[in-house]
């Protein structure tokens, strides 16, 4: 999701402290057979755990670490410009909680097991009412590239998207020039569907993006044989 749905310049909410959900809520998430979004996740995202990675709700206290991780040139070059201050990330985190409560968006902090520092994010936004179709994206501190953190985190997010949000089609975009991002998407089973010409503006120029998609049926067909790491919801 190189075009992040958050627009800092359009966020006029000033009362960050009252808008933030500062208490982490975990709960049982029930998978439904129809494409109706469970209401549970809107009150607070569950903690998703793997062998090395835990994904949880963003908190105001994550602002400083996200600022350090996501504003470096190598991380930020292929995503919408991230906030440029710690305060800007606090505003972004407050916005993610409002959008989650509205039932249109979910954003997880990426942490390592045994450590609570946020080292990146995974996000999902609906592109069709009720999450029939959605778009997902990610940003991870460069120190954790090539370590398996993305792979495990992506598996957790995809499971959440298809089993909890009941997504039918999950899309992603990556700039053609973003070799690492394209490789990461292919590695988790995303299928390239085309190229969106000059669809993303960055640093004063328009870039072509590759459009990827994962369908629910395809994901269910391959997950049991290709994903070996155990993962679960923490209740």
Question: Where is each model-derived feature located?
Answer:
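Acyl-donor (CoA/ACP) binding surface of acyl/acetyltransferases
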Residues: 2-74, 107, 111-235
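Conserved GNAT-fold acetyl-CoA-binding loop/helix
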Residues: 74-95, 106-108
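A generic secondary-structure signal
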Residues: 95-99, 160
């Amino acid at each position: 999701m190189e075009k992040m749905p958050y627009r800092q310049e359009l966020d006029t909410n000033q009362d960050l402290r009252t808008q933030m959900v500062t208490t982490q809520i975990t709960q049982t998430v029930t998978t439904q057979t129809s494409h109706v979004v469970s209401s549970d996740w809107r009150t607070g995202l569950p903690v998703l755990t793997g062998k090395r990675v835990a994904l949880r709700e963003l908190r105001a206290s994550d602002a400083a670490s996200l600022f350090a991780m996501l504003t470096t040139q190598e991380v930020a070059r292929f995503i919408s410009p991230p906030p440029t201050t710690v305060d800007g990330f606090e505003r972004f985190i407050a916005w993610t909680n409002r959008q989650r409560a509205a039932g249109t968006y979910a954003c997880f902090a990426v942490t390592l097991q045994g450590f609570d520092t946020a080292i990146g994010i995974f996000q999902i936004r609906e592109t069709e009412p009720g999450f029939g179709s959605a778009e997902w994206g990610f940003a991870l501190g460069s120190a954790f590239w090539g370590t398996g953190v993305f792979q495990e985190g992506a598996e957790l997010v995809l499971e959440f998207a298809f089993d909890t949000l009941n997504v039918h089609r999950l899309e992603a975009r990556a700039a053609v020039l973003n070799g690492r991002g394209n490789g990461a998407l292919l590695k988790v089973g995303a299928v390239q569907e085309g190229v969106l010409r000059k669809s993303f503006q960055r640093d004063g120029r328009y870039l072509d993006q590759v459009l990827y998609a994962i369908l629910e049926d395809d994901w269910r067909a391959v997950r049991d044989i290709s994903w070996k790491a155990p993962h679960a919801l923490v209740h």
